Amino acid sequence: MMFRVTSVGCFLLVIVLLHVAAVTSDDCRPEAAYCEYNEQCCIDKCCQASCSDACRTPGKRVHGHGLLRFFGQR
């Protein structure tokens, strides 16, 4: 009889632990949501306090066009 109680208790403990693991693993933020760390995002990228697939540097494109215009005139 003691064996059954122990087995049932262990079985229930395993179920509870699996449930807790499933709940904590689903705790991520979708794209464009506010974030502070990469681990908070489902896509594992936090760029400028927002979950984003690619980090963009503001002004980089404008700077590149300026160089192309400068070299194109020569």
Swiss-Prot record:
Domain of life of the source:
Eukaryota
Which cysteine pairs are joined by S-S bonds? C28-C42, C35-C47, C41-C51, C46-C55
Q: Does the keyword Chaperone apply?
A: no
Q: Which InterPro entries match?
A: Conotoxin-I_CS, Conotoxin_I2
**Record Pfam families:** Conotoxin_I2
User: What are the residue ranges of the propeptide?
Assistant: 62-74
Would you tell me the Gene Ontology cellular component terms?
extracellular region
GO MF entries: ion channel regulator activity; toxin activity
Q: Which tissues carry this protein? A: Expressed by the venom duct.
- Chain positions found as Proline amide: P58
Q: Which UniProt keywords apply?
A: Amidation, Cleavage on pair of basic residues, Disulfide bond, Ion channel impairing toxin, Neurotoxin, Secreted, Signal, Toxin
Does the record bear Secreted in its keywords? yes
Q: What is its main location?
A: secreted
Which N-terminal stretch is annotated as signal sequence?
A: 1-25
Q: Where is this protein localized, as stated in its record?
A: Secreted
Q: Which family does it belong to?
A: Belongs to the conotoxin I2 superfamily.
Recorded domain comment? The cysteine framework is XI (C-C-CC-CC-C-C).
How is this protein named in the record? Conotoxin fe11.1
